[in-house]
Amino acid sequence: MLDILLLRKDLASAVARLETRKKPQAFLNVEAFQALESERKTIQMRTEELQSQRNQLSKQIGMLMGKGEKDAAEAAKAQVAAIKAELDGSATRLDQIQGELQTMLAAVPNLPHESVPVGSDESANVEVRRWSPDGQQPRSLGFTPKDHVDLGEPLGLDFDMGVKLSGSRFTVMKGGIARLHRALAQFMLDVQTQEHGYTECYVPYVVNADSLKGTGQLPKFEGDLFAAQKGGQDAEPVPDNAQLYLIPTSEVPLTNFVRDEVLAEAQLPLKLTAHTPCFRSEAGSYGRDTRGMIRQHQFDKVEMVQIVHPDKSYEALEEMTRHAEAVLQKLGLPYRVMSLCTGDMGFGAAKTYDLEVWLPAQNTYREISSVSNCEAFQARRLQARFKNAQGKNELVHTLNGSGLAVGRTLVAVLENYQNEDGSVTIPEVLRPYMGGQATLSV
């Protein structure tokens, strides 16, 4: 959530930055905001005036009673009662205004950092760097590559079974390919915990609405979530605050560890990681990536979260991006790093890097990780603070990133390590997790 003081101080600048995002008119109704702010100021000024009058009258009442001027004292008491009634009404309206402002701000995305490229869609994203084991360009396989579907189905990917069990955009894995998927997740966790200093966490796969509000998925993106229904058809409706949702990413539970907490500065940075399934409705994705595992309702991901001092968050962003890159480099997978433009960033991000892995069958790069600095945007919603050197409570900065999406990494391994006979060479770093197995073959 944006700092309302920033909007009050320089609304025009904030609006100008918001207008660089996609569909800015959907974020903030400037006229409605200004009207509420004007009414708030009027009420507060009137409240101060009435409080001053009440204090003066209260003093007069004591003096009048002391002089025996009972009628005048009673008249002053009547004025005080009238002022109290008006103050009570003003307080009620002020609470309503504050609530309306909070609801309005909950729908407003984060302000882009000044270093973010300006643009309306992914065509304006800027390539930062690229990497390949053979130099900057991916090597040619020397034959026409198969995609992961044609490669994977003989090896144990079963899309038909996924449809049978759950519907479209679900996948079943069996045998060696299921083991390879598990090996990737274990390898990623080991890299992040043993080499990069993250604490491994096991978290619930369902969370409450407060958790999703804290990280920004609610209220604006409820349509992207899977709600967990309680009871049967005759069960009573679930109150909003008791509704549970399947996690869209373990960023949600991990970041909510610090909700309503005040940390010691010495505890920063907190570096957390978890391997979980993620559940997304993929609303608005009809017709996109319908073949294979690229866009699924359920997929596994190893998530990285850092809770940091505000002065350190952009250093942490670069560090976390390198942590995600390290996994790709150890796997020998060609990739590029993209700085997302203002129109392509997520709701809570101030700056985002996407890592895109090379898929030979598509002859293109596809997203495999997103690493974002949310600055204080989530922390303000979460009331996540630390006690600074001056002894004052200050909002932390939060960052999150994929380290990596396991299913998409499996896709990349299948396609980049395929052989002309349809077998797949297992990357050397994964072989200890595969009992020494060097290839997947029918």
Swiss-Prot record:
Binding of ATP: at which residues?
A: R280, S281, E282, E367, I368, S369, S370
This chain's function reads:
Catalyzes the attachment of serine to tRNA(Ser). Is also able to aminoacylate tRNA(Sec) with serine, to form the misacylated tRNA L-seryl-tRNA(Sec), which will be further converted into selenocysteinyl-tRNA(Sec).
What protein name does the entry list? Answer: Serine--tRNA ligase
| Keywords, comma-separated and alphabetical | Aminoacyl-tRNA synthetase, ATP-binding, Cytoplasm, Ligase, Nucleotide-binding, Protein biosynthesis
Q: Which positions are tagged coiled coil?
A: none
Question: Origin organism of this chain?
Answer: Acidovorax sp. (strain JS42)
* Lineage start: Bacteria, Pseudomonadati, Pseudomonadota, Betaproteobacteria, Burkholderiales
State the family it belongs to.
Belongs to the class-II aminoacyl-tRNA synthetase family. Type-1 seryl-tRNA synthetase subfamily.
Report if keyword rRNA-binding is assigned.
Answer: no
The GO biological-process annotations, alphabetized, read as: selenocysteine biosynthetic process; seryl-tRNA aminoacylation
Show the SUPFAM superfamilies listed in the entry.
Class II aaRS and biotin synthetases (SSF55681), tRNA-binding arm (SSF46589)
According to UniProt, this protein's pathway is:
Aminoacyl-tRNA biosynthesis; selenocysteinyl-tRNA(Sec) biosynthesis; L-seryl-tRNA(Sec) from L-serine and tRNA(Sec): step 1/1
The protein's matches in Pfam families, at most eight in alphabetical order, are given as: Seryl_tRNA_N (PF02403), tRNA-synt_2b (PF00587)
In the record's own words, the domains note is:
Consists of two distinct domains, a catalytic core and a N-terminal extension that is involved in tRNA binding.
